[in-house]
Amino acid sequence: MVNKVVDEVQRLVSAIILTSFMTGLFILSLWKNYVTVHFQHKNDPRDTRSSRTKIQPNDKKKKRPARHSRPLSISSTTPLDLQRDQENNIEYDRTVTSKLSMTSNASLSENGDGNANIKMETNVNQAPYAAENPFQNIALAEDTKLVPDLKYYYKEYGIDIEEFEVETDDGFIIDLWHFKSRLNDGVEEVKREPILLLHGLLQSCGAFASSGRKSLAYFLYESGFDVWLGNNRCGLNAKWNMKKLGNDHSKKWDWDMHQMVQYDLKALINYVLDSTGYAKLSLVAHSQGTTQGFMGLVNGEKLYASDFKLVDKLENFVALAPAVYPGPLLDEKAFVRLMAKGIDSPWYFGRRSFIPLMMTMRKLMVGTKIFSFLSYIMFNYLFDWNDVLWDRVLRDRNFLFSPVHISVKLMQWWLSPLPNKLSFKKGAEKIFPDKKTWFPIAKNDDDSGNNLDNNKLHLNPKRQNSEEFPHIIMFIPKQDRLVDGERLINHFINHEANAVYKIWYIDEYSHLDVLWAHDVIDRIGKPMIENLRFPNAR
């Protein structure tokens, strides 16, 4: 009885503190937006710093990266400026979007008008596949009505979204969505390779699809893949099997990254494989989703029982803005430091849902321009991300599918400073030891010059060749200071076989640009599908 009283008092106190906290954040976000719009005019307002880590290739690799380019496309008249380092398997994307394009985009941002016409530089007659698309700008042809339901938009493209509920082994019911053509009139579709998309922190899988015909989800479907969109536990609508939880309501929020890797990822993958009849699938993940993927691959020997090993279920693992090591922003931002100091106290954040006020506001306001605008300015204030590279007419749509329910315990896993807790911020090197080999192969088919035989191994036993591990494809934004992508690059180029991975390092992208940039199809979508590995030709 006493514990229940204390719990209710903590909930009340934390509600008061968090309401004040969010009010202060809201005011600061509005003020920053006002100052930026009216007093700080910049052609390129982005934070162009990278993390503090420098990329350090193995000393034995002497060749300088070779420069090459790809032509302009339907989404941009700026040819891609690429620098290829074959020894380290890295493509350096040095492309800089023209100032004229960014200036016209910035003016739209300042006006806050998500429906304004963008001043176009694109000449579709110059694009190599201009005849394939009748629109000079696909984004301008999109429906700008704000509806928090992907099915509304995708019906316009001739795609149905099937919704499934998948139950995890520990009793959580998670949502899984599936693209299915509405135009085949009952004719069986050609068998497609399954691809599962997994979202980042405080997002749903709608983030992969909210840009409509300019989204990665749509592009993958149109490219011939069987697209599944996975959500983690609780998500937009929290659901549980209380019988499996022993009717213990405290267990509803007693979970963190470990349970998401052990149960959510396993349940989603098994459901897709059982539904499609394939033995393996490709996993495309963003941010937190990449943390789940890498944890399951690197530490699967410890996390999974013998009936499931993630490393044996994936043909490809595509990591967008991978969150493996913490970036400098976690220490630089006062708001994040303050949150980290209080995250372990139930008097500040409670013990259940993380800042439930966010979901209350979403329930009341989602589908309005003001909700999407406030979501954007808060992201902008907290992380210095902006919409310079996004299609402005789609910006409001992109915020329709966040935030989502997460647990306080999950945020403790991300931010806790306590020495007795293993957190991403303080213990990433223990979860992902960067001086050990994660994917060891007995037959070294690495031609990069690395002497991997002398490296210490982590948990995965040696396999005969790189084909027995998933093919790992990473797109790392240089301007992403939330995570340390450069440290992850250093790990792979110095401690993993060249044949296991492929990296793109994109100079002008930030954390969310890998999903929503106007040219994301050219800079991520196309190279992704060109490098996916399949045992049998499709």
UniProtKB/Swiss-Prot annotation:
The keyword Ligase does not apply. Residues 1-11 are cytoplasmic. It is a single-pass type II membrane protein. GO terms for molecular function: sterol ester esterase activity. Residues 33-538 are lumenal. Its main location: membrane. Not glycosylated. GO terms for biological process: cell wall mannoprotein biosynthetic process; lipid catabolic process; sterol metabolic process. Residues 60-70 have a biased composition (Basic residues). The chain crosses the membrane at residues 12-32. Its EC number is 3.1.1.13. The modification Phosphoserine is found at S73, S107. Pfam families: Abhydro_lipase. Residues 42-87 are annotated as: Disordered. One of its GO terms (cellular component) is membrane. It is an enzyme of class 3 (hydrolase). The keyword Transmembrane helix applies. The active site is at S287 (nucleophile), D480 (charge relay system), H511 (charge relay system). It is found in: Cell membrane. Keywords: Cell membrane, Hydrolase, Lipid degradation, Lipid metabolism, Membrane, Phosphoprotein, Signal-anchor, Transmembrane, Transmembrane helix. Present with 1630 molecules/cell in log phase SD medium. Mediates the hydrolysis of steryl esters. Required for mobilization of steryl ester, thereby playing a central role in lipid metabolism. This is Sterol esterase 2. It comes from Saccharomyces cerevisiae (strain ATCC 204508 / S288c).
